[in-house]
């Protein structure tokens, strides 16, 4: 049985371990998943029990949305009610990679992960372990940083185990994260004009090379429209 894996079990990325991770996600458990930015606390985005476990383990406010992680641009498009032309342009340049897009969501995306908003955040991570899991698992995965809300984000499997080991039955060890900085988040106006919600690994200049008209208005939005906009966010 997969649940015989002890708390904080770290494994190399092989097909058996991807199956073990998938079984845990399917049962509503959380796991540690590496990405190029930080290690994420992963759960099945369409499993209410798993999503609730993410919020519980992290002690994350329920009004702070989560980011969907998917395997490809096509998968992201399948969850979006509208995928703006400039969103596609950005995705084609920066995916897989540390760019999160905030777009109108289809009805099957639960309010539980969007904090009741009509938009959802999505990205394709650039890490072989994360991509292997996302390609093997049928549903999108939420994976905020695997730490208590407001504390330093983990960049190694050992860091996850030290902080959350008794709460996480399995951590996929993908080595140290290449970047160690959260993704850049870009939303869109109703007209499809991109707007930076959070700067991260991708700079404003890099974004402007693809979308010269991109907006950057720090402090304009008081509402938490996307992950990373909460004043005390580093999670």
Residues covered by each model-derived region:
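Active-site-adjacent structural elements in enzyme catalytic cores
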Residues: 3-235
